[in-house]
Design a protein with these regions (language model features):
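Conserved helicase motor core of P-loop NTPases
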Residues: 1-125
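C-terminal accessory regions
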Residues: 131-139, 144-239
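Low-complexity, intrinsically disordered or weakly predicted helical/coil tracts enriched
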Residues: 62-63, 79, 118, 123, ...
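Glycine-centered loop/turn motifs
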Residues: 113, 129-132
């Protein structure tokens, strides 16, 4: 599929960047920095209006709709996708570099504008597995900001106390698997040559079939990642 994209002269919005270095490409780290700075600006524009943290505020969208829409537009402007959570070119690899932290993450002291993801359904709070939000506010005003549907199926935003939602991870980058159902104007994919062998390989006696399963898995995974992009796509390929 990568060769197809490279040979497609019409794909002006697609960039294939090969690397032999196991370090995260510097060009991508610079883009991540720009992305987080943009989010930090839009979240700070909202959080500096301290009245928004009052319990009596009610529907936040009715007060600061434009600022909130800016945050979620910025949040959805770039999606960084990895094949895996750990190892070379992984989600945790990026978190390590960008945040300087490993699990468990200190969400109270991280800077505003860091994207976050809920990893388990929480029916009481109305947050689902895979929902992406952002850190907002400082110190006693630190909150998780999520957009969700209320009981009337209306789209609303909600401040959530970090202490009430435990299953949260940074979402600077996410796995391709977790990205299913998401879209972004720009997608950057970190892709390695090492194949993930299908878990049913022990049932296959014919080696050619084993290779077919492995390639088929990779093809589906890469297809899922590529189709998250609405306008621009960068594929970083570890060769």
């Amino acid at each position: 599929k990568i060769k197809e994209l490279e040979n497609d002269k019409k794909s002006k919005e697609v960039n294939i960047l090969k690397s032999i270095n196991k370090n995260i490409p510097l060009s991508l780290l610079n883009e991540i920095e720009d992305y987080i700075n943009k989010l930090r600006t839009s979240t700070t524009n909202l959080s500096k209006k301290e009245y928004i943290f009052q319990n009596s505020i009610g529907d936040l969208m009715s007060h600061e709709k434009d600022l909130i829409n800016n945050i979620f537009t910025d949040l959805q402007s770039h999606l960084i996708l990895c094949e895996k959570n750990t190892g070379t070119w992984s989600v945790e690899n990026i978190n390590d570099i960008v945040l300087g932290q490993r699990k468990p993450y200190d969400f109270i002291n991280l800077e505003e504008g860091i994207p976050i993801m809920c990893t388990e359904n929480n029916n009481e709070l109305g947050i689902s597995n895979g929902d992406i939000g952002v850190l907002i506010g400082k110190n006693e005003n630190r909150k998780f900001l999520f957009r969700k549907f209320n009981d009337n199926n209306d789209l609303v935003v909600d401040f959530i106390e970090p202490s009430t939602l435990n299953n949260v991870v940074p979402a600077i980058a996410i796995t391709i698997h977790k990205s299913q159902g998401s879209e972004s104007e720009k997608v950057s994919i970190l892709w390695t040559q090492k194949s993930q062998i299908n878990k049913y390989k022990e049932d296959l006696e014919d080696e050619s079939k084993l290779m077919f399963f492995r390639d088929s898995y990779e093809k589906r995974l890469l297809y899922t990642a590529i189709t998250r992009a609405k306008s621009f796509l960068d594929i970083y390929f570890l060769n």
